[in-house]
């Protein structure tokens, strides 16, 4: 459509959730009445298929949602996410951006493909997730939709919830 605001939120597999957060904020601020959030990811083109620990966690996908004003107490009530910079090199695509591009290619062509150190990421999660969860649950969350593809990671989430007193939120995986 002509004259409609449109922009890209490049946040990899978390892009859809981040776009919903931005859209909800725009609606809440009165900038927009309705927002179409469209996400697509073609992970299969950037995976190393010889790395079974990583390639089995990712797939191609797409999703779309139309967001609009909600009644009081409905809609997206809260979003909590965090980034821990010490894990920046644990889940990367080294080449393909501005540092190692087509004019300054990397020495190893595999640098154009996604690489992940799953064990180190799990250790990072085990360090940061308990305080993150405590802060999240202070507000009486009923449902958690984690951004987690790993069965080990989801198991860790469930164990952390089981250790808490009182009713645990539903985990949608």
What function would you assign to each model-found segment?
Residues 11-16, 39-44, 82-84:
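Acidic, glycine-rich active-site loops and adjacent beta-strand->loop/helix elements
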């Amino acid at each position: 459509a002509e004259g409609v605001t449109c922009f890209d939120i490049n946040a990899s597999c978390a892009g859809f959730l981040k776009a919903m957060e931005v859209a909800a904020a725009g609606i809440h601020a009165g900038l927009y009445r309705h927002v179409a959030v469209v996400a697509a990811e073609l992970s299969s083109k950037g995976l190393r298929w010889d790395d079974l620990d990583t390639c089995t966690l990712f797939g191609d996908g797409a999703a779309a949602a139309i967001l609009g004003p909600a009644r009081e107490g409905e809609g997206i009530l809260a979003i909590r996410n965090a980034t821990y910079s010490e894990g920046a090199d644990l889940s990367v695509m080294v080449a393909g951006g501005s540092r190692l591009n087509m004019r300054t290619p990397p020495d190893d062509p595999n640098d154009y493909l996604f690489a992940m150190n799953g064990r180190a990421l799990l250790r990072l999660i085990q360090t940061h997730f308990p305080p993150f969860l405590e802060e999240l649950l202070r507000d009486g969350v009923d449902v958690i939709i984690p951004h987690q593809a790993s069965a080990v990671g989801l198991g860790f989430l469930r164990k952390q919830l089981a250790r808490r007193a009182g009713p645990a939120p539903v985990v949608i995986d």
